[in-house]
Curated annotation (Swiss-Prot):
Probably functions as a manganese efflux pump. Belongs to the MntP (TC 9.B.29) family. The gene is mntP. It is a multi-pass membrane protein. GO terms for biological process: intracellular manganese ion homeostasis; manganese ion export across plasma membrane. It is found in: Cell membrane. It comes from Methanosarcina acetivorans (strain ATCC 35395 / DSM 2834 / JCM 12185 / C2A). This is Putative manganese efflux pump MntP. The chain crosses the membrane at residues 1-21, 39-59, 61-81, 102-122, 134-156, 165-185.
Length: 186
């Protein structure tokens, strides 16, 4: 595969991580650049790791991923989105929110990288070498996630709790989109 093809694949896979990073960036107070880096490292690492797992697993997990992955992604994103909305409406109003604990980051990273697992499986079926695509996918996702977190912070700084609610709705909508795409392909 050419560099351009791998780059475009990386962009496509990184869009979910970008949206989730932007949503997360709206809720973190106080926001530090290290928060954006933490998001970027988690999402970039998972987006790079999942194709490798898919490539190794190949057809063994193919049926599970195709049947249950969209539901898992939907449930994880909907749960975290509802949690964000609840915290925006009823949470501590002192302006300090930090939703970047490792368990939340892990769930978000898994939910946004399940499609990369399927890409890895397709690489295995096609006999495509995995190293170059994985590096490019991870780097593109890192940059997109970092930029998404900064953009989310900038928007959240101006609109406060309204953007937290919007961020939660984005996560729920993203989960719904993943599920709807799966249902349309059945």
């Amino acid at each position: 595969m050419s560099f351009l093809t791998n780059f475009l694949l990386g962009l496509g896979l990184a869009m979910d991580a970008f949206a989730v990073s932007m949503s997360s960036g709206t809720t973190i107070r106080p926001f530090r650049v290290s928060d954006a880096l933490k998001l970027a490292v988690f999402f970039g690492s998972f987006q790079a790791m999942m194709p490798v797992l898919g490539w190794i697993g190949g057809s063994t997990v193919s049926s599970f991923v195709s049947d249950y992955a969209p539901w898992i992604a939907f449930l994880l994103l909907a749960f975290i989105g509802c949690k964000m909305i609840y915290e925006a409406l009823y949470g501590d109003q002192d302006g300090k929110v930090n939703s970047l604990n490792y368990s939340v980051l892990f769930l978000l990273a898994v939910a946004t990288s399940i499609d990369a697992l399927a890409v890895g499986m397709s690489f295995a079926f096609l006999g495509t070498p995995i190293l170059e695509p994985v590096i490019i996918i991870g780097c593109v996702t890192f940059v997109m996630s970092f930029c998404g977190a900064i953009l989310g912070y900038r928007l959240g700084h101006f609109f406060e709790h309204e953007v937290e609610i919007l961020g939660g709705l984005i996560l729920i909508g993203l989960g719904g989109k993943i599920l709807a795409e799966h249902m349309l392909w059945i």
